[in-house]
């Protein structure tokens, strides 16, 4: 029989008395009444805030969105398969936040900031609230620096400035994502941090985009936020705000940032699904009444900050998918009214072989003109007008049997201008190359080149300038002005390439 020494017992009792903690922790808890379709109804949680994070017994997190008299409507940010009627819910006292920092660059994360690229955890110590207030009027500055996309048609006719919101709108499969990826690739030596937010897309599509960025070295300055089609609606709804928060961190550090929301149509659909399941009253096209606010508070976070705030900027390129080119539907008109212009992509132009398929007539940039570089502004002034007139004449000439010489000349030049603006995917052009191409077309220096050889001329001119006139390229890239000497050099180069092409054709 084991003998128990009294001093051992007293020592144990003393230790337990010393270790006794008399502090009482108060936790705000509730009970699940009903769960299904990504929504939980919870009784209790008396002190919960709107938008507060809550935690269920099985570890699933949710956001309290509907605060009603006798219950709280919570959207689940996970499968929630382990949640049952009667299980407890705990309020965390926190609003959703996301980790931020330089360690995010080159990574693929979900809308909660959790790495999903298999490269381990993120080594970040800072975080930002997913919902942050937009900069005020005094904290902003007017847009005055260019955000070069590398796409000649956009940089010449629909220029985008740093801090601008430019909508990319068009039907499915018209090259909306391609324009945005090209813009990211073009920031390689511009010291711009890019954030690509994929909302409700196929995981294969996101993997493909990520691979393209990695192959071309663009992932080093890019963060990918992915809420795939298989994710709960709550995560698809949160994804754009997460992307904005990650970009805001760099913006307030004084850096230029570019955020792409691909696409906000799917975010609006996820928000509609959540709202209908929460039994909020439906409005036009069954969207809730605050879907405009959902997008406006997101896009207002894009800004060009004042000198006192560090001169940083966030440029937003939201994408909207239309049905059969209908830009007068609810979500497209909402986002058009919030943004500072739109690039409209047409499926008819795309199918006719014009890539990028930009409809110049209804595309516009409302603030980017102030940010356009002088070199291209000087020569591209008439480009948009000439193309718009060409479209009208082309439609008219289908019914006219004989055309006068001036009209034929205008049609002939319009065809060549349109060919010049064709550009393969993943091949953005530098400013000097864009200036050279647009100059050749607008000044009528390639009117003798056959239309079918204009694309070849564009390629050969760029190669000729790189190999024979590198001083022209460096001058334009540094000074960003087309001086009389540079113009003379350019004219000589164009004449040389044209004569070589015509001689080889003969």
From Swiss-Prot:
Query: In which residues is ATP bound?
Result: 170-177
TM spans (from-to): none
Site (described: Required for activity): 363
Keywords of the record, alphabetical order, are: ATP synthesis, ATP-binding, CF(1), Hydrogen ion transport, Ion transport, Membrane, Nucleotide-binding, Thylakoid, Translocase, Transport
Query: Which InterPro entries does the protein's record reference?
Result: ATP_synth_asu-like_sf, ATP_synth_asu_C, ATP_synth_asu_C_sf, ATP_synth_F1_a_nt-bd_dom, ATP_synth_F1_asu, ATPase_a/bsu_AS, ATPase_F1/V1/A1_a/bsu_N, ATPase_F1/V1/A1_a/bsu_N_sf
Q: How does it sit in the membrane?
A: Peripheral membrane protein
Q: Where in the cell is it found?
A: Cellular thylakoid membrane
EC number(s) per entry = 7.1.2.2
Tell me which Pfam families the record gives.
ATP-synt_ab, ATP-synt_ab_C, ATP-synt_ab_N
* Annotated Gene Ontology cellular component terms: plasma membrane-derived thylakoid membrane; proton-transporting ATP synthase complex
| GO function terms (MF aspect) | ADP binding; ATP binding; proton-transporting ATP synthase activity, rotational mechanism
Q: What is its main location?
A: membrane
Q: Answer yes or no on keyword Cytoplasm.
A: no
Signal sequence span per UniProt? none
Reaction catalysed? ATP + H2O + 4 H(+)(in) = ADP + phosphate + 5 H(+)(out)
Matching PANTHER family: ATP SYNTHASE SUBUNIT ALPHA, MITOCHONDRIAL
Question: What family is it from?
Answer: Belongs to the ATPase alpha/beta chains family.
Outline the subunit composition.
F-type ATPases have 2 components, CF(1) - the catalytic core - and CF(0) - the membrane proton channel. CF(1) has five subunits: alpha(3), beta(3), gamma(1), delta(1), epsilon(1). CF(0) has four main subunits: a(1), b(1), b'(1) and c(9-12).
Q: What role does this protein play?
A: Produces ATP from ADP in the presence of a proton gradient across the membrane. The alpha chain is a regulatory subunit.
Write down the NCBIfam families for this protein, in alphabetical order.
atpA (TIGR00962), PRK13343.1 (NF009884)
Name by which UniProt lists this protein: ATP synthase subunit alpha
């Amino acid at each position: 029989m084991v003998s128990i020494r009294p001093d051992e017992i007293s020592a144990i009792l003393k230790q337990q008395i010393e270790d006794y903690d008399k502090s009482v922790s108060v936790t705000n808890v509730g009970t699940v009444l009903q769960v299904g379709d990504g929504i939980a109804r919870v009784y209790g949680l008396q002190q919960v805030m709107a938008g507060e994070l809550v935690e269920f017994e099985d570890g699933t997190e949710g956001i309290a969105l509907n605060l009603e008299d006798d219950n709280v409507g919570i959207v689940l940010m996970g499968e929630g398969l382990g949640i049952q009627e009667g299980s407890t819910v705990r309020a965390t006292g926190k609003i959703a936040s996301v980790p931020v920092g330089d360690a995010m660059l080159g990574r693929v994360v979900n809308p909660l900031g959790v790495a999903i690229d298999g490269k381990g955890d993120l080594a970040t110590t800072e975080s930002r609230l997913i919902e942050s207030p937009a900069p005020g009027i005094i904290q902003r500055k007017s847009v005055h620096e260019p955000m070069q996309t590398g796409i000649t048609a956009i940089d010449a006719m629909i220029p985008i400035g740093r801090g601008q919101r430019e909508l990319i709108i068009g039907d499915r499969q018209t090259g909306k994502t391609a324009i945005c990826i090209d813009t990211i690739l073009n920031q390689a030596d511009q010291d711009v941090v890019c954030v690509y937010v994929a909302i409700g897309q196929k995981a294969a599509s996101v993997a493909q985009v990520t691979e393209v960025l990695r192959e071309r070295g663009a992932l080093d300055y890019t963060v990918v936020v992915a809420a795939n089609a298989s994710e709960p609606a709550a995560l698809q709804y949160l994804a754009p705000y997460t992307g904005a928060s990650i970009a805001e961190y760099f913006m307030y550090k004084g850096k230029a940032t570019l955020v792409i929301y691909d696409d906000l149509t799917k975010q609006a659909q996820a928000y509609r699904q959540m709202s209908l399941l929460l039994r909020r009253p439906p409005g036009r096209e069954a969207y809730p009444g605050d879907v405009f606010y959902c997008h406006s508070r997101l896009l207002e976070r894009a800004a060009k900050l004042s000198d006192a705030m560090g001169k940083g900027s966030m440029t937003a390129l939201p994408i909207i998918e239309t049905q059969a080119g209908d830009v007068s539907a609810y979500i497209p008109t909402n986002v058009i009214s919030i943004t500072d212009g739109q690039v409209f992509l047409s499926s008819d132009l795309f199918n006719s072989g014009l890539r990028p398929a930009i409809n110049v007539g209804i595309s516009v940039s409302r603030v980017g003109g102030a940010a356009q570089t002088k070199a291209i502004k000087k020569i591209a002034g008439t480009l948009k007008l000439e193309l718009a007139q060409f479209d009208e004449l082309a439609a008219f000439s289908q019914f006219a049997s004989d055309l006068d010489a001036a009209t034929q000349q205008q049609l002939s030049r319009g065809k060549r201008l349109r060919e010049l603006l064709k550009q393969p995917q993943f091949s953005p052009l530098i400013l000097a190359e864009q200036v050279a191409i647009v100059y050749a077309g607008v000044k009528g220096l390639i009117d003798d080149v056959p239309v079918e050889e204009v694309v070849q001329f564009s390629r050969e001119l760029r190669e000729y300038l790189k190999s024979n006139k590198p001083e022209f390229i460096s001058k334009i890239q540094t000074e960003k002005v087309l001086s009389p000497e540079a113009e003379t050099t350019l004219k000589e180069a164009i004449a040389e390439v044209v004569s070589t092409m015509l001689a080889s054709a003969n």
